[in-house]
Amino acid sequence: MLYRDEAIVLRTHKLGEADRIVTLLTRQRGRVRAVAKGVRRTTSRFGSRLEPFTHVDLQLAEGRNLDTITQAETLTPFSKGLGLDYDRYTAGTVMLETADRLVAEEREPSVQQFLLLVGGLRAMVAGEHAPGQVLDSYLLRSLAVAGYAPSFEHCARCGTLSAEGAHRWFNPSMGGMLCSTCRVPGSASPAPETVALLGALLAGDWAVVDPAAARNLKEASTLVAAYLAWHLERGLKSMAYVER
């Protein structure tokens, strides 16, 4: 059966002498793996349309294990904009790997994750905000869509609001900020400004994020990375290339 969908190319790997298996995050069918036949030949009709970061409109033939790409048209070549800036490119690779890991089930619709990734890549290319903060905002929101929303205002354990404006303790395994009563050993103690920044990153409140102090941005990035690693159960390979 043939079907059409739009997708972001997450990654590819070689298959045989001329083909590739392409991992896609599609709008309607979630994560899909498909064969692109002959794509590695110089005469391939696909050209560079099936490279990572490309937003494409596809026609595919459904298969038992792997679908087959029969047509591909580029909608947005995000790689062109990202390739001009190392920091934006490496941050973008983290976004792709995160989407690949958080949308674990194949062919399970995940429209919100797809739209979030497209929006995140578009923001990364636009360059209106620092790449590190675009990445952190994407990571928090992607985790929230996947069901791992962190709690920054209420205690993640008992649900109380802080009388002082922000709880003091942060623990990834507990789901975010903790009050003094619920604090567990090994919890971090971020600055109140950092806690407010984390909430703004989750909400996409750039009026708060953009003017934030460097020390708070760095502390927030460290906590976001720790929260992501906890819920993915292991770190991302691409994160090693991002300056945090």
Swiss-Prot record:
Organism: Nocardioides sp. (strain ATCC BAA-499 / JS614)
Role played: Involved in DNA repair and RecF pathway recombination.
InterPro entries linked: ARFGAP/RecO (IPR037278), DNA_rep/recomb_RecO_N (IPR022572), NA-bd_OB-fold (IPR012340), RecO (IPR003717), RecO_C (IPR042242)
Entry similarity comment: Belongs to the RecO family.
GO BP annotations, alphabetical order: DNA recombination; double-strand break repair
GO CC annotation: bacterial nucleoid
Protein name: DNA repair protein RecO
Keywords carried by this UniProt record: DNA damage, DNA recombination, DNA repair
